[in-house]
Regions:
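N-terminal Sec-dependent signal peptide, specifically the hydrophobic helical h-region
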Residues: 1-31
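Solvent-exposed loop/turn motifs of extracellular immunoglobulin-like beta-sandwich domains
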Residues: 3-10, 35-44, 51, 81-85, ...
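Surface-exposed, proline-enriched loop/turn segments that connect beta strands in immunoglobulin-like
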Residues: 28-32, 130-135
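Solvent-exposed strand-loop boundary residues in beta-sheet-rich modules
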Residues: 60-62, 81, 109
Length: 140
């Protein structure tokens, strides 16, 4: 009887530990956006079971863990850290912002690194149209 109770307790403990520990994962995966030049762009990212630090990268260049991003005055990382929300806001978007972005969550304890990509396409406000003229014949 004692052996059965010990086995039952052991199974129960394993189940509790297995359900209590879940890997961090994206609750909201960043989605690609198309914005007009000058508009605000918000790339969303939300993480469940957050354990690691979160940052955004632009074309492979890490932007850092702070909400204020050095060298990028139009960029801010904002959201609700308690709920794992780390959105990237770009104000007055320009053609230099047209890039591939990645929400990155670092490793911690037994949690693995996770990454999710989204592209930002900035549409030029003004397009230049050119007309091709056919040469005119001179009549003498």
């Amino acid at each position: 009887m004692c052996a059965k109770i010990r086995n039952l307790i052991a199974v129960f403990c394993v189940l509790v530990v297995a359900t209590a520990f879940q890997q961090q994962y994206f609750r909201v995966v960043p989605r690609s956006l198309r914005v007009q030049e000058g508009a605000e762009a918000v790339l969303e990212c939300a993480v469940a079971n957050l354990a690691g630090q979160v940052q955004w990268a632009k074309d492979g260049f890490a932007l850092g863990f702070s909400s204020v991003i050095p060298g990028y005055p139009r960029y801010t990382m904002f959201g609700d850290r308690r709920h794992g929300v780390y959105n990237l806001r770009i104000v007055n978007s320009s053609l230099v912002d047209d890039a591939e972005y990645q929400c990155q969550v670092g490793p911690a304890q037994m949690h693995k690194v996770i990454r999710a990509n989204a592209s930002l396409t900035v549409i030029c406000k003004y397009s230049i149209l050119s007309r091709f003229r056919t040469p005119t014949k001179l009549v003498k």
